């Protein structure tokens, strides 16, 4: 919970996390501020991250579990984390919240956005056939290859996603077009800095769109976002196209009527 709760200074003022964002409320309100995070699930997910961090010898990891309809965050973990009771032993890198502030090229998880955008723009259906897909293509003198040479050359759009095909994803993105794909990603919050309950929020790195950028973005390379924005984007696609605002604070649930995808 260290990144969620945040830190206070020597004068008991919040300087990060919920402690900073809700500093006044925490000092003045009579009732406690209730979070959406489930402590048991938070513990289990943290343990899994630590286990796989050891297996893969990674420097850090993050995970978010969110209700796709309400936006309530059930678990949000960033590793490494820290113990505020042992401040002198904390390295600065442990303060960094990878789940909300870390900006990454997230790779193949973007292929879901590519297919969703194509379906939303009505240029592709799940059973649309793509034939004679090569194992590699050239763009501006650089090669884009399939990660798996066993991927068949004839696939439907749905099968491209299932098999995680790079070239197939590029072909789908080409049907969408640069402006439509860019606008779709902005609409679902993947390319825009989003409002959240804590201030530690990352900003996707801006870039210039072009044919090659469209191609690589279709499979999640050359385009960045945060895990929190990824969760928001997936939630919108999963819940039927309704906008959702990720939150850590329990509120009275309201029906989500802002449909942003067709």
Could you say what each language-model-derived stretch is?
Residues 8-10, 39, 81:
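Non-catalytic surface loops within mature trypsin-like serine protease
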Residues 12-13, 57-58, 105-107:
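Short N-terminal helix-initiation segments at or just after the protein's N-terminus
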Residues 25-61:
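Conserved, well-ordered alpha-helix/loop/beta-strand core segments that scaffold catalytic motifs
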Residues 63, 67-108, 113-262:
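Beta-lactam-recognizing serine transpeptidase/beta-lactamase-like catalytic domain environment
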């Amino acid at each position: 919970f260290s990144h969620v709760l945040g830190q206070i200074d020597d004068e008991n003022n919040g300087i990060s996390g919920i402690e900073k964002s809700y500093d006044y409320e925490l000092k003045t309100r009579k009732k406690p501020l209730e979070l959406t995070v489930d402590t048991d699930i938070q513990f289990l997910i943290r343990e899994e991250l630590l286990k796989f961090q050891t297996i893969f010898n990674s420097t850090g990891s993050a995970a978010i579990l969110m209700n796709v309809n309400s936006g309530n965050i059930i678990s949000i973990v960033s590793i490494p984390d820290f113990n505020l009771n042992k401040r002198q032993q904390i390295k600065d890198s442990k303060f960094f919240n990878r789940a909300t502030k870390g900006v990454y090229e997230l790779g193949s998880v973007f292929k879901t956005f590519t297919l969703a955008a194509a379906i939303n723009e009505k240029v592709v259906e799940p059973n649309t056939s793509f034939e004679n897909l090569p194992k590699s293509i050239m763009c501006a003198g650089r090669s884009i290859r399939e990660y798996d040479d066993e991927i068949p050359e004839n696939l439907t759009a749905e099968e491209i996603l299932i098999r995680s095909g790079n070239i197939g994803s590029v072909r789908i993105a080409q049907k969408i077009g640069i402006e439509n794909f860019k606008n779709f990603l902005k609409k679902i919050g993947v390319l825009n800095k989003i409002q959240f309950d804590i201030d530690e929020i990352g900003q996707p790195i801006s870039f210039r769109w072009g044919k090659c950028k469209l191609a690589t973005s279709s499979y999640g390379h050359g385009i960045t976002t945060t895990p929190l924005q990824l969760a928001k984007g997936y939630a919108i696609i999963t819940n039927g196209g309704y906008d959702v605002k990720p939150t850590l604070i329990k509120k009275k649930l309201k029906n989500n009527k802002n449909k942003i995808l067709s």
